[in-house]
Amino acid sequence: MYSVLQLLKCLCSCWRKGPEGRRFQTEAAVCARPAWSPHPAGASEALGALPPPRQLVEKRRVSPPRRLDQSGRDGGAVAKCSLSRGLSPPGWTGRSLLRPWGSAAVLGSRAALACVLRPSRGVMPATIQSRR
């Protein structure tokens, strides 16, 4: 099996020589034939074995976790929880902590994520506890 660089180099040199050139036949044989060849060890099969370009570069998308309560009542609980665990970096305001995914996305720690997903009952106000 040839590397992609060798195949591309060979295909470029074969293409430059053209079908009239003498070295075209030998280079095509040495380089596992050009991409239009139906040969089983052809360059098209070797290039087809590569993953699509989308998989070569992994992009990590940080998706915000779902809010526990759709009305937004858990925002204060998350802020208190992350502050009580000492996860808030200096310079953060209380407003930026009210977003439930703020600390988890920036810090990327499991503690912050667990805190966002499961705020402890001791942090929640008594009114919210009585409604549940």
From Swiss-Prot:
Which top-rank group of organisms is this from?
A: Eukaryota
For the region Disordered, give the residue spans: 39-93
Q: Where is the composition biased (Basic and acidic residues)?
A: 56-72
Q: What is this protein called?
A: Putative uncharacterized protein FLJ34945
Q: Which organism is it from?
A: Homo sapiens (Human)
